[in-house]
Amino acid sequence: MKEKKNESSLSKAIILLVLSIVIIIIGLKFVKASTSITLLVGGAITSAVAVLWGTKWDEIEKTLFDNVRLMGIGIFITMAIGLIVGSWILSGTIPTIIYYGMQMIAPSAFLFIACLLCSIMSLATGTSWGTIGTLGIALIGVSQGLGIPMQYTAGAIIVGAMFGDKLSPLSDTTIMAPAMSGTDIISHIKHMLYTTIPGYIISLGLYLVIGSRFSGSVSSETSTLILKTLGEHFNLNPLTLLPPIIVIALIVKKMPSIPVYAVGVLAGCVFALIFQGATLSQMAAALGSGFASDTGVEIVDTMLSRGGLNGTMSTVSIMLCAAVFGAPLKASGVLHTLVNALERSTKSWKTIMASSYIANTIFLLITTSYYVCFTVIGPIFQPIYERYGIPKKNLSRMLEDTSTALCWVIPWGMSGIYASGVFGVSVMDYALYAPMTWLGVVFAFIYIATGRFVGKIEPAKSEPEQTHA
């Protein structure tokens, strides 16, 4: 009787999971609905099915609020970025960066340099979101001035930002992954090099190849017009570069994110008053609706008409709807049911490792947050890895390869939503040009199949001893 109940639970878990995926595909690809509406409808339908199958609504509601709470910092950072962009354009900070950046960086080298710069900053600060929200924003303007399509720029910046987020000992994910897996941070970082460095090198090579196509992308007339227009409409004082320098310095000192961005917004407003003669009404407009450029030069107006709190609301709505989408799947225990079934059906350490990658990816699709994945998947698989004699540094690497990295290429994932909002392009547009985000998983499966770079596999209870380099 118990076996039949387990089989019934497994079939229901599979049906709920497949149903949610089908809704996403139909909504986004065929109905062409917005991401928010698709997630909201998906959450409503799967909630109804879960309740009919015995999940209590109170549990779904509690899970929903837990999801929103976990997303809280991401929501506020997204809103803060809108305020920063509006104030930094009004202050002349971003126009100044564009002005000097266009003269100092060749279009052919821009993507390569942008990736390296973001790598350095993220390694030093340990934050990918902070890197994108400061240095990334500045590089966006430069890329537009150089005529480089935004999907390429987004890919290069994300790869650079994520590189440090995965490997910096200051990164919260680098600290959390080994803590949730039962290993130490040094072993974790060293082990991640095997899946991170190859993807990073391939990404840099891709940016050199793509960059070679843009050696003459901006005509001298267009470049001159952009520089001339910026010089006529803004006071391009080098001192206007202080706001991002202040923010970066505070991030390096590991100050809390929200106060740091508040200082950045305040600095932008003060510099707008001092250097651009902005009025309080202009500040309020830039912070609320975004900076509205009216130079009469279309390419410049397109570059600078950005930011503002209102412009972040669509991104915030996607985050909230993602919480709705994941709540019934998490509350109904879909993941635990699938993991238990996987463990019962396998006898191989290779299958266990591969299953952990698949399970964590599924859970990331459900919850949209790598923080949730770390705190749930790590403890679930830690005893399983121990039983099969698998070094737990493989578990921590798995959490980073899937959660930290793949979250950038999931349209409703927290990182993907954030990046899409900052860059103004969809996740599907830039995913191909951020290969390090998904190549880590590819290399991980190669290592699992070949037994390379997984450490020494101790004998499981039912298996003979195996050793792998």
Where are these regions (language model features)?
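Hydrophobic transmembrane alpha-helices of multi-pass solute/ion transporters
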Residues: 2-80, 89-109, 231-233, 245-321, ...
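Membrane-embedded alpha-helical segments and adjacent helix-loop junctions characteristic
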Residues: 55-144, 296-383
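Transmembrane alpha-helical segments and their short flanking loops
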Residues: 176-186, 210-246, 271-296, 303, ...
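Alpha-helical transmembrane segments of multi-pass membrane proteins, especially transporters
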Residues: 38-46, 66, 70, 74, ...
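Hydrophobic transmembrane alpha-helices that form the pore/transport pathway of multi-pass ion
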Residues: 107-194, 198, 360-401
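Generic alpha-helical transmembrane segments of integral inner-membrane proteins
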Residues: 18-22, 26, 44, 48, ...
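Transmembrane-helix bundle segments that line or gate the permeation/cavity pathway
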Residues: 157, 162-170, 199-216, 447, ...
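C-terminal transmembrane helix pair
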Residues: 8, 180-196, 200, 327, ...
